């Protein structure tokens, strides 16, 4: 867009769009419950369990440019007395549980809030864990296919695809996973059966890429 200077010469200026989301901050329980309205994920039911999770954890959230909550994720101790924490302990065992943290699935009202939210939440979880394990849970839905590569970019590795506590199938991710083989096996994210078999045999997804046809492929390594 151009404006006219007083001397008659044109000057080009760049007009930038205002930021759509604000910096990440800690949310109150009320703000998180506001975001949960209409949320269909089984991990956030019943509401009494959500209130228990809010009591023992903290909420990392981001607002839109108008100040309304745009997205949030719960940070929970792995030793918490909640159904999801117990399900993770049953899968992972007790090693590293003391001090460990995990991220619940994000509740998003704006898709562009996901990446800054997950980046800040993962950094916060690592600080709280103080060397303990850091895990993340993502319910296996149509929306999770777009979110999974964002988790992997933050340094989390996909370690399991399984039901948790009789809930819907979930992706379970973990920090601090290293590959033992330099050559990956590329598996389409949509090939759930093959993906689950490789994960169950000890593989981990440490990278992802998209094909020209917008198909997401996961790089699976023995871990």
Regions found by a protein language model. Give the residues of each.
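C-terminal "cap" of GNAT-fold acetyltransferases
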Residues: 164-188, 214-223
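Conserved beta-strand-loop-alpha-helix junction that forms the acyl-donor binding cleft
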Residues: 136-148, 187-190
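Conserved acetyl-CoA-binding loop-helix of GNAT-fold acetyltransferases
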Residues: 108-127, 153
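Short amphipathic alpha-helix that is part of the acyltransferase structural core
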Residues: 6-49, 54-64, 68-70, 182-186
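Conserved catalytic-core motifs of GNAT/GCN5-like acyltransferases
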Residues: 139-140, 152-171, 204-212
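Conserved GNAT acetyl-CoA-binding A-motif
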Residues: 100, 127-142
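A short helix-loop-beta-strand connector motif used in the catalytic cores of GNAT acetyltransferases and
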Residues: 50-61, 65-66, 71, 76-83, ...
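Conserved acyl-donor/pantetheine-binding loop and adjacent beta-alpha core of acyl/acetyltransferases
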Residues: 68-107
